[in-house]
Amino acid sequence: MNRFVIICLLFTYYVIWSLLPIFEIENSNPVVSLLFPISSNVAIFLPIFLLLIGFTLTGSVLGVLLIRSDKKKKV
């Protein structure tokens, strides 16, 4: 299957999942409960958590690279 189609489907799922509380249909329908078993609050905090982890890892890698390059210049 094409990657673009998979990414579009995941994005559509995420958007619907994050918009459920706005229309107050999160727990009203059993089909919705089956399709979206985790609370929509998780959909809001998930990108924040992933961004924090990404920035932390990027900063750590850049810091290690800067320290290593500085040590090589001194030797």
Curated annotation (Swiss-Prot):
GO CC annotation: endoplasmic reticulum; endoplasmic reticulum membrane
Domain of life (superkingdom): Eukaryota
Keywords, alphabetical: Membrane, Transmembrane, Transmembrane helix
A GO biological process held by the record: dolichol phosphate mannose biosynthetic process
Compartment(s) of residence: Membrane
An annotated Gene Ontology molecular function: enzyme regulator activity
Family matches, as InterPro entries: DPM2
Annotated transmembrane regions: 5-25, 42-62
Membrane topology: Multi-pass membrane protein
Keyword check for Transmembrane helix: yes
Protein known as: Uncharacterized protein YIL102C-A
Species: Saccharomyces cerevisiae (strain ATCC 204508 / S288c)
